[in-house]
Amino acid sequence: MSGTLVLVRHGQSDWNLKNLFTGWKDPDLTELGIQEANTGGAALAEYGIKFDVAYTSVLVRAQHTLKLILDKVGQPDLLTIRDQALNERDYGDLSGLNKDDARAKWGEEQVHIWRRSYDVPPPGGESLRDTGARVWPYYLTEILPRVLRGEKVLVAAHGNSLRSLVMVLDKLSREGVLALNLATGVPMVYKLKADSTVASKEVLGDMSGAH
C-alpha cells in the first residue's frame, strides 16, 4: 500500500510583495503569507490527514509556512528534515533585484527568457532544468521511498523546486511546466501507486491565486 505526498508552496514573502527576484535570499512571510499558510493548514486539518514526516528547504519562508501548517494539523513536533536540495531556484545576479529594474537593465525579452525558459539560466544562477537536477534525485532517494512504504509525507518548499517535482509527477512537457503556476499556501495531495506513478491528485484550494 503506497502512501500520500502533499506538496505546498510557501506563503507570500516580503520579496514577493516587493516584486523582487528572491531565489536563495531569505526573506520571511508577509501577513498575507502567514494567512495563506494558515489557510492551507486548515484545509489539511479538514481533510483529516496525519503526517509521518515533513521536508522543507533551508530558507525561512518555507520553514515558517511548514510550522504554521503543522500547528494547524495538530502536529507541531513532527519530524522535520531541512535540505538545501529543496531550495528555490537560484536566480544568481538577478537575486534581490526588482523585476522591473531587471527588465530596464537587460530588456524585457531577455528577462522573460531567463524567467520562463526551461534551460536558460540567468547569469550566475540556475535554470528550471538545473533546479530539477538537484530536486528530483533528492525526491527519489529521500522522499519517495517513505511514500512507497505507506507514509504520509508533507513537503513545504518553493515555486520552482515544486514545479520541478510536479513536472514529473503530472507528466508535463517543457511547455506545460513553463505555463504552470503554483498558488502560495495551497496543498496538492498526491496518492501514489506502488510503481511510484500518480493514482490521484487533489488540490485543496484555489490555484488561480499564484504570485
UniProtKB/Swiss-Prot annotation:
Site, as annotated: Transition state stabilizer: 158
Residues the record lists as binding substrate: 9-16, 22-23, 61, 88-91, 99, 115-116, 159-160
Top-level taxon: Bacteria
MF terms (GO), sorted A to Z: phosphoglycerate mutase activity
Biological process according to GO: gluconeogenesis; glycolytic process
InterPro entries: His_Pase_superF_clade-1 (IPR013078), His_PPase_superfam (IPR029033), PG/BPGM_mutase_AS (IPR001345), Phosphogly_mut1 (IPR005952)
Catalytic activity: (2R)-2-phosphoglycerate = (2R)-3-phosphoglycerate
Active site: 10 (tele-phosphohistidine intermediate), 88 (proton donor/acceptor)
Keywords: Gluconeogenesis, Glycolysis, Isomerase
Annotated pathway: Carbohydrate degradation; glycolysis; pyruvate from D-glyceraldehyde 3-phosphate: step 3/5
EC nos: 5.4.2.11
Pfam families in alphabetical order: His_Phos_1 (PF00300)
Similarity section: Belongs to the phosphoglycerate mutase family. BPG-dependent PGAM subfamily.
Subunit-level organization: Homodimer.
HAMAP family: PGAM_GpmA
Biological function: Catalyzes the interconversion of 2-phosphoglycerate and 3-phosphoglycerate.
Protein name per its UniProtKB record: 2,3-bisphosphoglycerate-dependent phosphoglycerate mutase
